[in-house]
């Protein structure tokens, strides 16, 4: 994650913190941060039903996609530090917009967020940087996918864009691989499935870092 590099951070002065998002991730962040003696107020935007359950925490019913209203509210609340949780606002460049207004932000800019928001971009990044990764093919039509599927024994099928954690499939056979690929390309995940990544299936334990 990227923190605004134009200013040094004095954590003892991070009294008013804003957390962008409305999920369990944001609640977990608020729960951890409210334990700090330095923090006085945590505003979760827009938050959810549990956002006000922790001390120092308050949910604000505000649409963070309206950046003009968001910035006005952040200034009004004298926010010292902003954490952006969800992938979509990061991919859409919210961190970049806030940094241009000289806010201190924890979260990648839209360029860094591409590692999450576009699987094909991330795979090409790894390939160009000689970072070990499974072989892959990028397709935008079922006609392009068929010869790849027919010549491969075992593939993972992935919608290229953000699909709320539901865009990755591990088919059991070629027919299932073809069906899933066609389903994604036909709009199961909207624009997130305009491109499909067909990836070599690797065997072994899965580890997240």
What are the functions of these language-model segments?
Residues 81, 132-134, 155-157, 171-208:
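Conserved ATP-binding module of the ATP-grasp superfamily
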Residues 9-12, 35, 52-53, 106, ...:
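Solvent-exposed alpha-helices and their adjacent loops that cap or buttress functional pockets
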Residues 58-65, 137-141, 171:
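Short acidic-hydrophobic, aromatic-tinged amphipathic segments that line or gate anion-handling sites
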